[in-house]
Amino acid sequence: MKIIIAILIFSVLILFHELGHFLLAKACGVGVTEFALGMGPILVSWGKGETKYAIKALPFGGSCSMVGEDEDDPAPNAFGNKKAWQRFLVIVAGPVFNFLLAFICSLFFIGFGGVNKPVVYSVGEAASAGIQRGDIVRSINGKKITLGREIPLYLFSHPLDGSAEIVVERGGELLTKTVNTHREGWRMGISYMADESGCTLSQISAQSAAESAGLKAGDILVSIDGTKISTGKQLSEYFTAHPLDGSLIELVVKRGGEELSFRFLPSHYETEDLGFSAEYYYDDAAHLGFFGLVRYSAKEVVYWIRYTLMSLRMLISGQVGMKDLSGPVGIVDTIGQAVETGVENGGAGAAALNVLMLMILLNANLGLMNLLPIPALDGGRLLFILIEMVTRKRVPQKFEGLVHLIGFVLLMILMVFVLFNDVLRLFGK
């Protein structure tokens, strides 16, 4: 099922991209010889005027083949014989149409799923600075915030350093608060899940005090320092009354029917955070009105463009490695996970919203990548047209073709590498 959904998503993405090229080519008088969805052998084709329309066997890809696109052609409707601004519009239309599709998907995503307003829904240490539940975050250190998800994106590229100036809206009034962001304390390095069977350790953090002591995921908590623990409430109450202070602690757990005792020192930590949460609050879009819906939909697209730019910056700076890149196989797996998670948490409607969010991300990603000056992609061709428009001298077509050929070969090598990564990642699961 996830493969079918992924094929449909890829098909819509590429069809819209190529449709942009197609419509602007027709508008600028460029002859289109073939407009196809997919690659490889033709399954179905039909003709209308000068254009052959086709559906091909492989669902990944698509094409809008124009007269004189890659070679000299004396025909007046050849792509190469059109003015530079006309060629620019034809090429840039593909990425622009991806942004347009991302915007359309955002309208549905926000209309049915709600708007991700930066409303404070949980307050920790920031309460001492006057931050309250229900406050709407308007800016952090002067950076305007419109969506809740913009907060972690901002913090990733602007690390906190002791304090932060937060502007919040409360009852229609803007208030400026300065919060202390430095946190330090003690932790064991465990996560737990509480159910009928008790408090089960669900995760042990790598290189944590708990891991060094020998605790394992799946252990069932019996007691802490002699106090019996059988529910999540009891555990929370215990740490409220006895916060970790670096002293020796004893945990008794049940593993395989046997009770085991572990004594260890919690580890000290220092970190920075805002002391409140406002990232994942969703408000009903019904009160937004038409222009509000359009505004927030545009912000959603801008958010994913910025997210893609940040990911590229991380790749270039070495914060993430080439092994973290994903291709079609990895995207299919991600789509499958999004559908499964949605069905488990909220049924078909939640799954559809997850798919819509992925559509927004993928369209923003495809649109942006095709605007970058990468040979063989739209951005590379746009660069040569811009050079021509500035210098008023056209770059020799043979030289441009050679540059695009080299770029295409390098992209194919990258695709093979990414495919190999995807397969290794899948088998690694």
Describe each model-derived feature in a short phrase.
Residues 2-75, 369-391:
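Small-residue-rich helix-interface/hinge motifs
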Residues 10-14, 65, 98, 102, ...:
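Alpha-helical transmembrane segments of multi-pass membrane proteins
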Residues 402-422:
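Final/C-terminal transmembrane alpha-helix of multipass membrane proteins
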Residues 86-122, 152-157, 162-205, 250-252, ...:
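PDZ/PDZ-like peptide-tail recognition elements
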